From Swiss-Prot:
Record key words, sorted: Cytoplasm, GTP-binding, Initiation factor, Nucleotide-binding, Protein biosynthesis
Record region (Disordered): 112-138
GO molecular function terms attached to this record: GTP binding; GTPase activity; translation initiation factor activity
Binding annotation for GTP: 233-240, 279-283, 333-336
Span list, region G1: 233-240
Compartment list: Cytoplasm
Organism whose genome encodes this protein: Anoxybacillus flavithermus (strain DSM 21510 / WK1)
G2, as annotated region: 258-262
Biological function: One of the essential components for the initiation of protein synthesis. Protects formylmethionyl-tRNA from spontaneous hydrolysis and promotes its binding to the 30S ribosomal subunits. Also involved in the hydrolysis of GTP during the formation of the 70S ribosomal complex.
InterPro entries in UniProt: EF-G-like_DII, IF2_II, IF2_N, P-loop_NTPase, Small_GTP-bd, T_Tr_GTP-bd_dom, TF_IF2_bacterial-like, TIF_IF2
Record's protein name: Translation initiation factor IF-2
Region (G5): 369-371
Pfam families, per database record: EF-G_D2, GTP_EFTU, IF-2, IF2_N
Amino acid sequence: MSKMRVYEYAKKHNVSSKDVIHKLKEMNIDVSNHMTMIEADVVEQLDRSFSKEQKQELKKEEKKAPVKTPVLEQFEEDEDEVIQTKVPIKKAVVKNREGKKHDLQIQQKEKKIFNNKKNKKQKPQQAPQQEVQKKKEKELPKKITFEGSLTVAELAKKLGKEPSEIIKKLFMLGIIATINKDLDKDAIELICSDYGVEVEEKVTIDETEFETIEIVDNPEDLVERPPVVTIMGHVDHGKTTLLDSIRQTKVTEQEAGGITQHIGAYQVVVNGKKITFLDTPGHEAFTTMRARGAQVTDIVILVVAADDGVMPQTVEAINHAKAAKVPIIVAVNKIDKPTANPDRVMQELMEYELVPEEWGGDTIYCKLSALTGEGIDNLLEMILLVSEMEELKANPNRRATGTVIEAKLDKGRGPVATLLVQSGTLRVGDPIVVGYTYGRVRAMTNDLGRRVKEAGPSTPVEITGLNEVPQAGDRFMVFEDEKKARQIGEARAQKQIVQQRSVKARVSLDDLFEKIKQGEMKELNIIVKADVQGSVEALVAALQKIEVEGVRVKIIHSGVGAVTEYDIMLASASNAIVIGFNVRPDANAKRVAEAEKVDIRLHRIIYKVIEEIEAAMKGMLDPEYEEKVIGQAEVRQTFKVSKVGTIAGCYVTDGKITRDSSVRLIRQGIVVYEGQIDTLKRYKDDVKEVAQGYECGITIKNFNDIKEGDVIEAYVMQEVARK
């Protein structure tokens, strides 16, 4: 018998990898994970061990089988004996005519004895039932429940006592009460404790905030569910091609000549088990949904091109997956190319703690070609293996809850939403609340374009019947009736749930010390962006050394270049602070940061960053001047004039540029110079300010290296007191 891996043995003998690992550990054989290679002699030991267990189980079943039969046989034997005793008596009567009367008397006596025995058996059965009924009437309840308060009459009714008796007890406790007096929780508990009855107060749950309601299922009701997979990676590394290849090989082979319908997600069947793929490649959608509190992904496939290696977006994708605490499977794509070097990719990814199993790590690497289809079956098997180890389960036997994947307004069908059912079962006709809209599920379509009547956990379906279009990432919940769904949907709309999300409390340096004191924070998440890689490394190293009150700094992402919208979304999802060193946020990043209430700190000196973070963590931040950007202008043309210098012909794109404001020159997201405006002109006239949509000429004091395409940002310093 040859060597094999743990998961191969499990697959061959139709047992789970966890059972095999557990058995090996019982045999004192060191096993790290499901990819560990086991020797031939160990395989034989396993075979013997599993065969013994099977034999023991069979013996147990044989012993358990004949439990009730002896009682029945004994009962039948007793009946036979009774019949046999009667038969000879009848025969004796027939043979002996003279003693006929005597025999009849004997027979009647025997009947009476037999009937008496029957009555004796029946009477003890009836008597206890009557006694139990009497006892039940007198017995006090073990527990009573109430909501808010109870009157004396209501409490007496719950306890099965007279109100006068309760009033007497209250009087003995120093409480003068009438039959209609409302009793508080303490009084109810005192009376009930006197009777030895347990009290439970019902807490009213606000179902309008159903995202915060956590329903704990009975472990017996949980069943295995398909994993939900998201594909991430750098641009042009083959994410979309891989999705298309999986769909063509697995979905279209089920559909003979059928056209699949794009609903934002689809399912494939591998070895009789389903896998759900979110058809939204890239980490942007992933992070946007996570920022809204929707954690839908179970496994992330990180696609890296074998001929290109690790790129900036690859690193971003790794950081996003780690921040969400989702297992990563690395798909090394384009191995069919002559320049492919998978080993180089593995080596580069080791820097980001993605160590291959072949090299002693715990990250699964799959070499494949999305174009030719090579290695795709192996990738799908690995997804099922990781899913098995993660023990993904859900309860299908309750009202459905889940998340919106996509939503749109269709001309013919009205609002259409793609929902991913995460728990329970969604059925046609269910009253549903989605985000801040509501409706009844009118029709359901699966990813193959077929009408379905119900959808279980991890199943994506497209539904119609909502009154408005929800947002991607919104949570949904099914309610018992349409009236309640309408009430909750309208209440949520009135609370303007969308605006409340944007006002979500974020961590900032201003309130950092308070959160540390209250024990709310154990780690301070930070995103670092700088102008050059050397600055990034120096800043990260310096920040990681900071530790105050047991709170450590955790760098969740770092990179070179301007602060982007995606950095802000990651900070929003991870409750992080963004630090920009010698770089500026672009216009979109500023807008998103303001909406998501993300704290951005911009610096040009490293020790100032360290000082500010340490001071914030110690609660020693002084009042400071806050920078307020008042406008931006784009340099369209430059003019060199002797004795004046370089004049920048600008177009004001945002806000306004004022004569007395400070300015900074930004080139490709990097700050080149900071200073003051020397002259500000419109045509030939000096002006105090130029508003958005107008052209102007600007010169900067002591600086002439202005180029076309540069951005001039105007700002003023305002003094603000810290709270």
